[in-house]
Curated annotation (Swiss-Prot):
The keyword Metal-binding applies. It comes from the Bacteria. GO terms for biological process: cytidine deamination. NCBIfam families: PRK09027.1. Pfam families: dCMP_cyt_deam_1, dCMP_cyt_deam_2. Gene3D superfamilies: Cytidine Deaminase, domain 2. The active site is at 112 (proton donor). The gene is cdd. Its EC number is 3.5.4.5. This is Cytidine deaminase. Keywords: Hydrolase, Metal-binding, Zinc. Belongs to the cytidine and deoxycytidylate deaminase family. It comes from Haemophilus ducreyi (strain 35000HP / ATCC 700724). Homodimer.
Length: 299
């Protein structure tokens, strides 16, 4: 099983452009082409599109959601969900659901997780708004409750805008109930000893930014993608099951960097020894999604 190809993405975008046949969609798709299909819009581009089409940021985000959905990988559901995480910086980060055939359903990345992980890996400091084409499921509501902006986060749907996450997750259980002050998107203070070659060292450095306050099982994955190194990191959750594993994070980021057609030659995982491990799940996904053996280092 492989990740969706760039040609498949281009085909979906062409179909969407034909169906919509309106200036905003065409302009955004053209911009994506110019940036080699990296699924994000910088703050200056967001401002430019808002001015050009006389739209608010939220209206522009709603216009981007069907485009974000074109990045979905859905061999199981055949149902594409698109999301746009709006950073405090003003940048837009696209997300889409990522499913993996031939492996457990629990390996799935939800669209909101996809957009949030995309923003986190891109260096965004916080998320102010989440725009999505479908009502967030309970899994995603709980995942978003881990954010450092959970109390102010605004959720926007095509049929309903400007509702807080708290309106979707009443009497929520979250990190504060477990006395966690330094939450997702806050700076983490983890020190791990460096070792190994450049790919291993990149993985270790990424693991130092992982978020695992409940198990302490910080981990990261690095992919050798052509000449580039793409990393993903573990994002734990107070409810445990909505946690996002590092290989899913890395594969998702690869997709939104427009590199899904570039072969992965190595996959390395670094994990701190703790009460639990995600090695076996990650090993299975590496073999199924990439046809590669996971190189694993416990520190």
């Amino acid at each position: 099983m492989t990740m969706p190809t760039l040609s498949a993405l281009q085909h979906r975008l062409a179909q969407l452009a034909e169906q919509k046949n309106e200036p905003l969609t065409l302009a955004i798709i053209e911009q994506l082409k110019q940036q080699s299909y990296q699924g994000a819009l910088s703050a200056p581009l967001v401002q430019q599109f808002c001015q050009q089409f006389s739209l608010s940021k939220i209206e522009l985000g709603l216009g981007c959601v069907p485009i974000a959905a074109c990045y979905a990988l859905t061999p199981v559901s055949h149902f594409c969900v698109g999301a746009v995480a709006i950073g405090l910086s003003g940048s837009f980060y696209f997300g889409a659901n990522q499913e993996f055939a031939g492996i457990a359903m629990q390996q799935t990345v939800h669209a909101e997780q996809s957009a949030i992980s995309h923003a986190w890996l891109a260096g965004e400091g916080a998320i102010s708004d989440m725009v999505v084409n479908c009502t967030p499921c309970g899994h995603c509501r709980q995942f978003m409750n881990e954010l450092n902006t959970a109390t102010t986060l605004q959720i926007h749907l095509p049929h309903r805008q400007h509702n807080t996450l708290q309106q979707y997750l009443i009497d929520a259980f979250g990190p504060k109930d477990l006395n966690i002050a330094n939450v997702l998107f806050d700076q983490q203070h983890i020190v791990l000893p460096l070792q190994g070659d450049a790919l291993v060292q990149a993985t270790i450095k990424e693991a130092q930014q992982a978020y695992a306050p409940y198990s302490q099982a910080v981990s990261a994955v690095a992919l050798q993608v052509g000449e580039q190194i793409i990393c993903g990191r573990y994002a734990e959750n107070a409810a445990f099951n909505p946690s996002l594993l590092p290989l899913q994070s890395a594969l998702n980021y690869r997709r939104f960097l427009g590199l899904s057609d570039v072969a992965v030659s190595r996959v390395v995982m670094v994990e701190k020894r703790a009460v639990l491990s995600h090695y076996h799940m990650s090993k299975a996904l590496a073999e199924t999604a990439l046809g590669l053996t996971l190189e694993y280092i416990a520190v």
